[in-house]
């Protein structure tokens, strides 16, 4: 006679149903957390899904800035060029709403002369590589690049990306958990 314990084992319909319910709960919880994180961006006026506070964004950017700078050769050694980048960035802040935000903007010219790039971290650190800087011909072009990066910060693009990652991880976690349950039950 088969014991009732064996009939209700991992591979049984009851065990499988419970695992499906757990996976479904994980998915629903992830979607609800994502949807409940909506807010209206004060600068852009757009509805966004962000899971970080502005303070958390600033802390994340300040924490990540040294490592990111190091990956691109650190700050450029030319004080005149470094000063121009900072001055143009500050002019943009002084003449736009971005300067009235709580973000901790900083503007750094990086020494990397091979990678043509500019980027912003959450909370305000803005970087431009010397490879891109050296290709710009006017202060207006530099302002365009820095303004674009400032726009990413005030539009909270990094915070939106992190919220989407959390949603994706929650859904993927449920799928992986469900798949591993299937694999484990097939080995018994």
Regions found by a protein language model. Name each.
Residues 1-182:
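A Zn2+-metalloprotease active-site environment signal
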Residues 183-188:
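Single conserved hydrophobic/aromatic residue that forms the stacking wall/gate
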């Amino acid at each position: 006679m088969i014991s009732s314990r064996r009939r209700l084992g991992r591979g049984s319909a009851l065990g499988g149903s419970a695992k499906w319910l757990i996976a479904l709960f994980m998915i629903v919880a992830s979607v609800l957390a994502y949807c409940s994180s909506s807010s209206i961006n004060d600068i852009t006026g757009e509805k966004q899904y962000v899971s970080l506070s502005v303070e958390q964004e600033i802390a994340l950017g300040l924490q990540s800035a040294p490592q990111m700078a190091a990956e691109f050769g650190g700050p450029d050694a030319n004080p005149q060029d470094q000063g121009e980048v900072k001055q143009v960035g500050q002019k943009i802040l002084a003449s736009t709403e971005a300067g009235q935000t709580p973000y901790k903007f900083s503007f750094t010219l990086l020494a990397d002369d091979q990678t043509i790039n500019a980027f912003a971290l959450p909370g305000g650190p803005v970087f431009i590589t010397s490879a891109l800087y050296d290709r710009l011909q006017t202060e207006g072009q530099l302002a365009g690049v820095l303004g674009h990066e400032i726009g990413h910060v005030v539009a909270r693009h990094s915070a939106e990306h992190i919220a989407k990652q959390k949603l994706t991880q929650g859904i993927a976690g449920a799928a992986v958990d469900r798949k591993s349950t299937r694999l484990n039950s097939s080995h018994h």
